[in-house]
């Protein structure tokens, strides 16, 4: 079972994503802030799904950059999906090293399919 860390400061969103991904066979650690995400991250983490906007002026890009710079326990090439309701964030997320950008709202099955595709390649 792939290990996924989902980060969104909206508790309802993070719980919904956790439920949907677990139904599709993923092991999910649901986090509402960067500190929790860092605590759940380890070398067995296969992917991250991170909301762009997080609480306290934090951004999903902060976690993405930390992963890519080797500042977390995850491997530097761990798959990272950034999501946002603002399409203008896509280029910045991809330039920072995100594997994919998901524009919210997206169909419930799209995330699972994308994760399966990223993890199989």
Describe each region flagged by the PLM:
Residues 8-9, 51, 85:
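Acidic di-acidic motifs
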Residues 11-29:
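Two-component/phosphorelay signaling modules centered on CheY-like receiver
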Residues 29-47, 55:
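Acidic, metal-coordinating helix/loop segments flanking the phosphotransfer/catalytic sites
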Residues 46, 72-79:
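His-Asp phosphorelay/catalytic-motif detector in bacterial-type signaling
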Residues 50-67:
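Conserved phosphotransfer microenvironments
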Residues 81-83:
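Hydrophobic/aromatic residues positioned on beta-strands within the core alpha/beta folds
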Residues 85-102:
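Alpha4 helix (beta4-alpha4-beta5 surface) of REC/receiver domains from two-component response regulators
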Residues 106-115:
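C-terminal output helix
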């Amino acid at each position: 079972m792939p290990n996924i860390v989902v980060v969104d400061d909206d508790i309802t969103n993070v719980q919904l994503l956790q439920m949907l991904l677990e139904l599709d066979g993923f092991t999910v650690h649901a986090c509402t802030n960067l500190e929790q995400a860092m605590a759940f991250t380890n070398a067995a983490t296969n992917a991250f799904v991170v909301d762009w906007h997080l609480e306290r002026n934090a951004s999903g890009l902060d976690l993405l950059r930390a992963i890519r710079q080797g500042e977390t326990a995850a491997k530097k090439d761990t798959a990272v999906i950034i999501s946002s309701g603002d399409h203008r964030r896509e280029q910045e997320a991809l330039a920072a090293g995100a594997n994919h950008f998901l524009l919210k709202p997206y169909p419930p099955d799209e995330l699972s399919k994308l994760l399966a595709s990223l993890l199989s390649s």
